[in-house]
A protein has these predicted regions:
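N-terminal active-site wall of soluble small-molecule enzyme domains
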Residues: 43, 48, 52-78, 83-119
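A structural motif corresponding to the C-terminal end of an alpha-helix
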Residues: 33-46, 73-79, 212-224
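Single conserved hydrophobic/aromatic residue that forms the stacking wall/gate
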Residues: 1-7, 11
Length: 230
């Protein structure tokens, strides 16, 4: 993004993980292969375990625990997990204390006070706001330096800015990751027939450009940004 910047974290939706959420995961690279690559470049790895419907019985899943253990046992760099479920957050804190937690944008916290309360939670190292809060500058500027350090903006969300069914969309993905037989979500966006395209991102009112980062966000004290669809 910037000449002086470097990637500090890479997040991944691992395939066939019941703890997953947001999108159905897929991939062909092994865990150790990915870990070696991250280590080579000094980049923190994150697991996207943002399923919103997890129950206690799901916490024993062998694959998800093995992935957490692999990241937790890394000695070279601190790794993290993006979570939605408080049940999972508590479990990870107890069993994998070396992993930091990131509050997922799938919580769809569109009310600024709800978002601020999330930022104030000590559980999370970072909080990703709903993209529709990206440019409420009159409120963002009032955050303390400590709070600003925890905010991580999603720069290029492609979903319709006016979406009223975002929570339901994510919930259906959570159900599908749990193996439930349910139909795919039907997108309510006016242009949904053209599909989910990253080429739409720059048309979104919440889009954050390189110039926005340089000229607006960084002078305000924000330094954490994430890119969807890497």
């Amino acid at each position: 993004l910037l000449a002086s910047s470097a990637a500090s974290d890479v997040y991944k939706r691992q395939a066939d993980c019941i703890w997953g959420g947001g999108r159905i995961g897929s991939g062909e690279h092994g865990v150790q292969e990915v870990m070696n690559l991250m280590s080579e470049y000094g980049i923190s790895a994150r697991l996207t375990f943002s399923n919103s419907l997890l129950r206690e019985e799901h916490l024993a899943d062998e694959k998800c625990n093995a992935l957490c253990k692999a990241l937790n046992d890394s000695e070279e760099i601190s790794n993290g997990v993006i979570v939605h479920s408080d049940i999972l957050a508590r479990y990870i804190k107890k069993h994998y204390p070396n992993l930091y937690l990131v509050s997922s944008t799938t919580k769809v916290l569109t009310d600024f006070n709800d978002f601020l309360n999330e930022v104030k939670r000590e559980d999370f190292q970072y909080v990703v706001p709903d993209f529709r809060l990206n440019k409420v500058f009159d409120k963002l500027v009032k955050l303390t330096d400590k709070e600003k350090d925890k905010v991580e903006f999603l720069c290029n969300e492609c979903c319709w800015f006016g979406c009223y069914d975002r929570k339901n969309c994510y919930e259906i993905v959570s159900r599908q990751n749990l193996g439930e037989d349910c139909p795919d979500h039907v997108c309510v966006a006016p242009d949904s027939q053209s599909g989910y395209r990253f080429s739409k991102a720059m048309e979104n009112p919440a889009f954050i450009s390189v110039d926005d980062i340089r000229n607006t966000y960084m002078p305000m004290g924000f330094s954490n940004f994430k890119i969807e669809g890497r």
